[in-house]
UniProtKB/Swiss-Prot annotation:
It catalyses: ATP + H2O + lipid A-core oligosaccharideSide 1 = ADP + phosphate + lipid A-core oligosaccharideSide 2. GO terms for molecular function: ABC-type oligopeptide transporter activity; ATP binding; ATP hydrolysis activity; ATPase-coupled lipid transmembrane transporter activity. Homodimer. Pfam families: ABC_membrane, ABC_tran. This is ATP-dependent lipid A-core flippase. The keyword Mitochondrion does not apply. PROSITE patterns: ABC_TM1F, ABC_TRANSPORTER_1, ABC_TRANSPORTER_2, MSBA. Belongs to the ABC transporter superfamily. Lipid exporter (TC 3.A.1.106) family. Residues 339-574 form the ABC transporter domain.
């Protein structure tokens, strides 16, 4: 059950309950009491036979039944506290593991999120942590309690007849062999179960998020078949674990029953030969019968342990993944906003194509710079590098002459507001979404930000106003309304650097006009980087940068680039800018 690797994992898990020493101490006391009551009940039954039935001792008729009742009462109380305390400890551990895992996921580099599906990560937080918690709550209590019980009963058996006990101990190595073999089989299948659960959760997440596309393209059967394939793989691996577990327990019981039959036969002969009293026989047989139940439970818990250890291995793989590098010590203040790319090269993990190749660019402070180029030209990559979602392979990026990796990461991002075309809103109030990450803002500040983003015009018409719950990712709002809330969030943050990645693509003409008016005000005294589809969002930019396959091809104002009669001019004249930027 516990090979070296399993012990290593379990020891690491135990650190999550090491802070609850008082609760653990109480649990261990109750476990010891439970273990002691098992042989006591067997001894009392033996004494009842010898003293009450054979010797006819009048005092034993009342005393021994009372003792037996007291033992069971004490055992019942101890079992109650043992169950409650062990579950409390395990639930605390589950909370700690789940919180640490989620915190780790939030700190993982963007590249790790790109390689692992959201559904797989969700499965680790929900399913894997639960399996690990079961191993902590059930396994340690069963192993501790039943190991002590077995030792107590074994001591009783040896005391009453060490010769008979030797016969029973022969089954020990046989039982251990079957438990070890079953453990290895269940560990493999349990690991596959974790993967199947992650894949199934991923399929479910994709289906629920993209249900409109699934319906419009008539792909319901295709998606259902993919989901059923994942669910079937999970079912098959679950059945493998169940079959091994179901075979393991009765096999051990059959071996134990054979040993019991042999021992009972020999013991009866000893009673007939008057080398053992009838009471001692009852005590011995009762103790031997009692010892098989904790053996069965320990054998049965093997499946839970293996599932938990497979899940723990999966969890620790995430926890051991390096977090985002944050070695910077400099805290920015009074940011001017000059951004420089100096011979920067970058490629995404797992791809051979270079996204940026020896790229250099100066983005002037407190000016608006627009990035133009076809899909894959490197526009969004530049934005992701400025925010340090990714690290450059070569070269440096500086803000006001300070390299990004020398700036404390949280401080860097505190000075940047980011509005993406993929608006992320939360199932909370409008006010909470606008003030996201800045709970200290009062309602008036939130209202002013909403007005600046021209979001107030629809917010004030809602029955609950700023307190309106907007649904999962703002599903109760239109695309333009969701976009304006995201822009209001950027207004409220009031960072010296603003990045707008196609931020007005979801707006109608009227909404865009209102946003452009607000943006003209927001641009003052801050560095603005715009990646937009529509010409109206970049025509008035202080600087337009034309990118192509990760290289800078042209830069200048709209008038200057038109005069060059090159890439930008051709896009403009062909009327394709709105589709190719």
């Amino acid at each position: 059950m516990f090979d070296r690797h399993t012990l290593s994992l379990y020891k690491r898990l135990l650190k999550y309950i090491s802070g609850y020493k008082s609760a653990i101490f109480i649990t261990l006391i109750t476990i010891a009491i439970i273990a002691a009551t098992e042989p006591l009940s067997a001894i009392i039954l033996g004494n009842l036979v010898d003293e009450s039935l054979i010797e006819k001792d009048p005092n034993s008729f009342l005393l021994l039944p009372l003792q037996l009742a007291a033992v069971f009462i004490v055992k019942g109380v101890a079992e109650y506290f043992s169950k409650v305390m062990s579950t409390w400890i395990a639930q605390k551990a589950i909370f700690n593991i789940r919180s640490e895992l989620y915190d780790k996921m939030l700190c993982l580099p963007q590249a790790e999120h790109n390689q692992t599906s959201t559904g797989t990560l969700m499965s680790k937080v929900t399913y894997d942590v639960t399996q690990t918690g079961n191993a902590l709550s059930e396994a340690w209590i069963v192993i501790a309690r039943d190991s002590l019980t077995i030792l107590a009963l074994l001591a009783t058996l040896i005391y009453y007849s060490w010769q008979l006990t030797l016969v029973m101990l022969i089954i020990g190595p046989i039982v251990a062999f079957f438990i070890d073999r079953a453990g290895k089989l269940m560990r493999t299948s349990s690991t596959d179960m974790q993967d199947n659960m992650g894949e199934m959760t991923h399929r479910l997440e994709e289906g629920l998020k993209g249900y409109q596309d699934i319906k419009i393209y008539g792909s319901e059967k295709y998606e259902l078949d993919r989901f059923k394939a994942s669910a079937e793989s999970l079912r098959q691996n679950t059945m493998k674990v169940i079959k091994v577990s179901a075979l393991n327990v009765p096999l051990v019981q059959v071996i134990a029953a054979i040993a019991l039959s042999i021992v009972v036969y020999i013991a009866v002969q000893m009673v007939n030969a008057e080398t053992m009293t009838a009471g001692n026989l009852i005590t011995y047989v009762t103790a031997m019968g009692l010892i098989f139940e904790p053996i069965r439970r320990i054998t049965n818990i093997n499946a839970t342990v293996q599932r938990g250890m497979a899940a723990a291995k999966s969890i620790f793989a995430i926890l051991d993944t390096p977090s985002e590098a944050n070695n910077g010590k400099i805290e920015l203040s009074n940011v001017n906003g000059q951004i420089d790319f100096n011979n920067v090269s970058f490629s995404y993990l797992g791809t051979e194509k270079t996204a940026l190749n020896n790229f250099s660019l100066s983005i002037p402070a407190r000016k608006t710079t627009a990035l133009v180029g076809q899909s894959g030209s490197g526009k969004t990559t530049l934005a992701n590098l400025i925010t340090r979602f990714y690290q450059v392979n070569h070269g440096t990026i500086t803000i006001d002459g300070i390299a990004l990796d020398e700036i404390e990461l949280n401080n860097l991002r505190a000075n940047i507001a980011f509005v993406s075309q993929n608006v992320v809103l939360f199932n909370d109030t409008i006010a909470a979404n606008i003030a996201y990450g800045h709970e200290e803002y009062d309602e008036q500040a939130i209202m002013n930000a909403a007005k600046a983003a021209h979001a107030w015009e629809f917010i004030e018409k809602l029955p609950e106003g700023l307190n309106t719950i907007i649904g999962d990712n703002g599903t109760l709002l239109s695309g333009g309304q969701r976009q304006r809330l995201a822009i209001a969030r950027a207004f409220l943050k009031n960072a010296p650097i603003l990045i707008m990645d196609e931020a007005t693509s979801a707006l109608d003409n009227q909404s865009e006009k209102l946003i452009q008016e607000a943006m003209n005000s927001l641009r003052k005294n801050r560095t603005v980087i715009i990646i937009a589809h529509r010409l109206s969002t970049i025509e008035n930019a202080d600087k337009i940068v034309v990118l192509e396959e990760g290289s800078l091809k042209e830069q200048g104002t709209h008038a200057e680039l038109m005069a060059l009669n090159s890439i930008y001019s051709q896009l403009y004249k062909q009327g394709n800018l709105s589709e190719q930027v």
